[in-house]
Amino acid sequence: MDRKYKDTSSEEEDSLNEDEMAWIPWYCNLKGNEFFATIDEDYINDDFNLTGLSSLVQFYDSALGIILDSDPDDPLSEDQQEALERSADILYGLIHARYILTPKGLAHMHEKFKKAEFGRCPRVFCQNQPVLPVGLADMQGVDTVKVYCPRCNDIFNPKYRRHSHIDGAYFGTTFPHLLLITYPELIPTKPPQQYIPKIYGFKIHKSARERQLQIQQKKNSLSNNNQNNQNNNINNNNNNNNNNNNNNNNNNNNQQNNNNQQNNNTNK
């Protein structure tokens, strides 16, 4: 099996013989795939766990064969190989979304969370709180994976761009919340601190900010009205010019008709 379509992420991987390494651990160790758990082959071999996926993945059987290290029956062209590898990516991601909701999958992700392998919250007052991957939808192709902070209860883009290609459906909308229910000791007990805007040491009153917002909205409204009036004036001027041109054309036509009439009278 050709495995050159992605680079490995560590010197240790470079030292391993890829021909002797199973596809699943090899795939999960690729740079950019650190969020993925290593799915047990027993889980994948159970057809019940894959129900409904065959209609979602092109070349399903061949892609499943790649994941389970089954050699293809016939030699593949480079284009065929790339298409199958892409299908294997998608299939593994869809299986992964189901696996991490199982007790064994949750336990695996629990260990990764404790090691902060998914990153930490970028918010200052969350004090480097580890985050969890989450999808904004359970349907593939809607959005990329985000990270959820259990301290501030907000979501962010992953820190590293190499994770920006991962589909959010490969983790789903349920996973982080199910993990925290399963392992309640992971829920931060300290409430998140909120930033308080101040000017010269004094807290900005909410009404002052609302007043500034109202003023800005009025300015925007006046600006839009002025722009609309200008556009209307331009349109009116254009219409007047068109009317003047039409009148001039009519006058010219009338003059031409008069000239023609005079010529006819002269000829008679």
Curated annotation (Swiss-Prot):
Gene3D superfamilies referenced in this protein's UniProt entry, alphabetically: 2.20.25.20, protein kinase ck2 holoenzyme, chain C, domain 1
Pfam families tied to this protein: CK_II_beta (PF01214)
MF GO annotations: protein kinase regulator activity
InterPro entries in alphabetical order: Casein_kin_II_reg-sub_N, Casein_kinase_II_beta-like, Casein_kinase_II_reg-sub
Gene Ontology CC: cytoplasm; nucleus; protein kinase CK2 complex
Region Disordered, residue ranges: 222-268
Domain of life of the organism encoding this protein: Eukaryota
Residue ranges that the Swiss-Prot or TrEMBL entry lists as coiled coil: none
PROSITE patterns, alphabetized: CK2_BETA
Chain intervals with Low complexity compositional bias: 224-268
TM regions (residue ranges): none
Role noted for this protein: Regulatory subunit of casein kinase II/CK2. As part of the kinase complex regulates the basal catalytic activity of the alpha subunit a constitutively active serine/threonine-protein kinase that phosphorylates a large number of substrates containing acidic residues C-terminal to the phosphorylated serine or threonine.
Family: Belongs to the casein kinase 2 subunit beta family.
Subunit structure: Casein kinase II/CK2 is a tetramer composed of two alpha subunit and two beta subunits.
PANTHER family: CASEIN KINASE II SUBUNIT BETA
Record's protein name: Casein kinase II subunit beta
Organism of derivation: Dictyostelium discoideum
